Structure formats: structure tokens, C-alpha cells
Amino acid sequence: MRCPYCGSEDTQVKDSRPAEDNTSIRRRRICPDCGGRFTTFERVQLRELMVIKKTGRKVPFDRDKLVRSFEVALRKRPVERDRIERAVSGIVRRLESSGETEISSEQIGLQVLEAMKSLDDVGFVRYASVYRDFSLAEDFEKVISEINAKIARDPLDR
């Protein structure tokens, strides 16, 4: 593994342990050349996924981009990073085990919306506003009224 600080090819693993519900390995590494310390994660990749964008263009699936979309929607919200990682890992697992090598960005967006519902209502509205391309205040009102109706039906399911 190349050192991100000095570019040396010779780094050493100091510590390895399971992470994220045993779906990845967290490794602490050190560079003998510059003394830099950094962390890497190793995950199983069942298959190479391609995302079909709305324009029809195909791009490789990027797990980090999925994490960033959660982080943007949940910015300044009381949602722990660990819960985001579990949601992302679940989505990736479902995508990889679907048997498909190409998946539409719409399908991914629907899975993110579903996961966001259980994480945070505000994050859900934020993500939905981008995913569903809200342009009017009524679009927000409709989603918020759906959330309020859900809360009224089952106030403990929050």
C-alpha cells in the first residue's frame, strides 16, 4: 500500500481488526520512510457494479460517493457515522447480491430513500428534495405531510 504522505511503496500493517459488523477489515498502517500513520479498510467486492446514469452513461459504482450522499443529507443531524456505514453496507450488499452487474442510479436512489426513512426524517426530506427534483414548496409540504401521517399512525416508530 502506497503511503499517502510520502508516496513510499513500503508500508507496514501495525494492527488489523474487523469493522462494520464484520463486513470489512480495518488496518492501521505505518510508513517506515516518513513515519506517517494512516488507516485503510478492506471489503469484499462480490462483483464489479456499473451505474447507469439518467443520461444513459455508465460509470463504475463508487461506495464513497454513496457515503457522501448520506453525509450531505444528514449534515448537522444527530446520526452517528456507524449508522450511516451500516446503511451503506446494507445497500451495497443488496446491490452486489442482486445478480445484476448494471444498476440504474434511480434504483440506488430508491434504496437510499428507504434507508434514510429509518435514519432521520430531516435527512429523508433533504435527500428526497434532490432525488425527486423538488421545485415547489408544495413538493416539500407533500413529503412532510407523509412523514407526519406516518408519525400519527405509529408515534413509537421514529
Curated annotation (Swiss-Prot):
Q: Where is the composition biased (Basic and acidic residues)?
A: 11-22
Q: List the disulfide bonds.
A: none
For this protein, the record's Pfam families field holds: ATP-cone (PF03477), Zn_ribbon_NrdR (PF22811)
Q: Which residues form a coiled coil?
A: none
Q: How is the cofactor bound?
A: Binds 1 zinc ion.
Taking every annotated instance into account, which residue ranges of this chain make up the domain ATP-cone?
49-139
Ion transport is among the record's keywords:
no
InterPro entries hit by this protein: ATP-cone_dom (IPR005144), NrdR-like_N (IPR055173), RNR_NrdR-like (IPR003796)
Going by the UniProt record, its keywords in alphabetical order are: ATP-binding, DNA-binding, Metal-binding, Nucleotide-binding, Repressor, Transcription, Transcription regulation, Zinc, Zinc-finger
Cofactor needs = Zn(2+)
Q: Which GO terms describe its molecular function?
A: ATP binding; DNA binding; zinc ion binding
Which family does the record assign?
Belongs to the NrdR family.
Q: State what this protein does.
A: Negatively regulates transcription of bacterial ribonucleotide reductase nrd genes and operons by binding to NrdR-boxes.
How is this protein named in the record?
A: Transcriptional repressor NrdR
The record lists the lineage as: Bacteria, Pseudomonadati, Pseudomonadota, Alphaproteobacteria, Hyphomicrobiales
